[in-house]
Amino acid sequence: KPERIASRFLFYCLASPWFIERCNLLAYGAKMPRVNWPTQLAQFNLPLPPLPEQKRIATYLDTSCAAIDAAVAAKRSQLDTLDALRKSIIQRAVTYGVEANPKLRQVDSDWLREVPSHWSVCRVKRVVARMDYGIGVSTVDEGRYPVLKMGNIQEGEIRFTNLDFIDEVDDNLILETGDLLYNRTNSPDQVGKAAVFRKSRTDAITFASYLVRLRVNHRVNAWFLNYVLNSTGFLAFARRLAVPSVQQSNLNSTRYAQMFIPLPPMQEQLAILSFLNEKTAAVDSVVATIQAQIDTLTAYRKSLIHECVTGQRRVTEADVAAIA
């Protein structure tokens, strides 16, 4: 009813935190929560200032939110730039090392074109003592052994969140510090991601069947290898090898093991690892600062909408003119 409520004011009412929170409280259905229109939503009481004030509030919020959204977009662009920088630092270090102007040699492999002349190039299987698929049994919400899944591998690290459990597992499938996990089945843009397991809990942990464990041998440092496996060049080729299916791709261990990797001497691996840990930590620190700024702007946007549509903040013509 346009004679009673301005459409943009109604939009901001429906987008306000208090309205969304009430909807969440009333929602029913486990798989697809929903709210009923005639018996629930239609019964909500909305704040209804005079129509001219509604339009003034909507105009003020349109301009204010557009400015906030532009600031957030600029900061997200900064995050994209930092992500590209992080990836380029890793890609260069694992393929050329950290010395300036190394003497290079050509190599005939799938994703590598040249490496420092004193480096080796070998297949993944040559630096791995064993490869194991994870458990294929059903998990439960509570149990003895936490189970890592594909969602627990993020940005080259393992996140111990949203864990499922099982009560029994073969001892051979308990993870040890230095074990690498790669995601053999996932969406085309996520398959192949890897992480190193570092034991930081007292309980034994295992892993699900969509993950493959690589236990390295004496030729490679697991954390250096993790940088290689997550480098843009290696991942791009690995994903080309993955077999697509409906919304998923599969990269089996046989194909993965055949891929080539650069292999510097061990001391150089450790030097590259130290360099990358320092550089990526610096980038990650800036990323965290920018993300905190985005979170602050997002929270302010929600708060501003809430205060304006509930009357906690009165919007005058002078307010609208000041931001026009």
Locate predicted features.
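Short, surface-exposed loop/turn microsegments at beta-strand edges and helix-strand junctions
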Residues: 3, 37, 137-147, 160-175, ...
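A short glycine-rich beta-alpha junction/loop motif
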Residues: 5-8, 28-55, 203-211, 220, ...
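Short, ligand-facing micro-motifs at secondary-structure edges
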Residues: 8-12, 21-28, 153-165, 180-207, ...
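Short, solvent-exposed loop/turn positions at domain surfaces
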Residues: 29, 168-169, 245, 288-291
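Non-catalytic DNA-recognition/assembly elements of restriction-modification systems
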Residues: 51-55, 66-67, 106-135, 258, ...
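Short amphipathic coiled-coil heptad-repeat segments
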Residues: 66-117, 289-321
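Sequence-specific dsDNA recognition surfaces
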Residues: 107-108, 122-137, 151-180
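Amphipathic alpha-helical coiled-coil segments
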Residues: 275-289
